[in-house]
Amino acid sequence: MSNVDHAEIAKFEALAHRWWDRESEFKPLHDINPLRVNWIDERAGLAGKKVLDIGCGGGILSEAMAQRGASVTGIDMGEAPLAVARLHQLESGVAVDYRQITAEQMAEEMPGQFDVVTCLEMLEHVPDPASVIRACHRLVKPGGQVFLSTINRNPKAYLFAVIGAEYILQLLPRGTHDFRKFIRPSELGAWSREAGLEVKDIIGLTYNPLTKHYKLANDVDVNYMVQTQREA
């Protein structure tokens, strides 16, 4: 059975044409992208690395990593986001290889081929996130690094990521997130360890609605990123 939620795919298909509009529903992704790329680059040294971006969407993260000197493959199951990614690539001239394929299928085709694997803001949109993490472990080379990000599952996360972001501040379209699919750091850590990945670091992303700025912080109550590593 495919680890794909077609309703989730449809949500982003409908919005895909606005993916690179920095004032659209994707503004939060554009705003946090430099923070995330810097954090990944500091830990993985992207230049010259072979990188796989799982759930790449319209290519915001994929292009940024390629601009740091990485050889990037971006995969997604949404046709429209991938079409937008390829179109933007023509404008930007940034080389990324985009493919419509699941992480699990990619792991069958290219096991142990990547120095770095990223899977950001995607795990909360699939039926079986642990399956994706197992695929990440298979895809990364021994000693390679896997970076994951998602949203914590607690009352504060519901208040900020759903009520605040979707209804009050209207940073995201209503229905973007399903609170039941949010993932606690303890769950993400357990799935990573079960897959054979060692958790190396965790960092939170916080948003100040007054300044409209994001920053990295030790507060992992809402948005957070995790660095993991496969044994050498």
Swiss-Prot record:
Q: Which GO terms describe its biological process?
A: methylation
Name the domain of life: Bacteria
Pathway, according to UniProt? Answer: Cofactor biosynthesis; ubiquinone biosynthesis
Reaction(s) this enzyme catalyzes, per UniProt? a 3-demethylubiquinol + S-adenosyl-L-methionine = a ubiquinol + S-adenosyl-L-homocysteine + H(+); a 3-(all-trans-polyprenyl)benzene-1,2-diol + S-adenosyl-L-methionine = a 2-methoxy-6-(all-trans-polyprenyl)phenol + S-adenosyl-L-homocysteine + H(+)
Q: Which residues bind S-adenosyl-L-methionine?
A: R36, G55, D76, L120
Q: Which top EC class applies here?
A: transferase
Catalytic activity, EC:
2.1.1.222, 2.1.1.64
Task performed by this protein = O-methyltransferase that catalyzes the 2 O-methylation steps in the ubiquinone biosynthetic pathway.
The family line of this record is: Belongs to the methyltransferase superfamily. UbiG/COQ3 family.
Protein name (Swiss-Prot/TrEMBL)? Ubiquinone biosynthesis O-methyltransferase
Origin organism is: Pseudomonas aeruginosa (strain LESB58)
Gene this chain is encoded by = ubiG
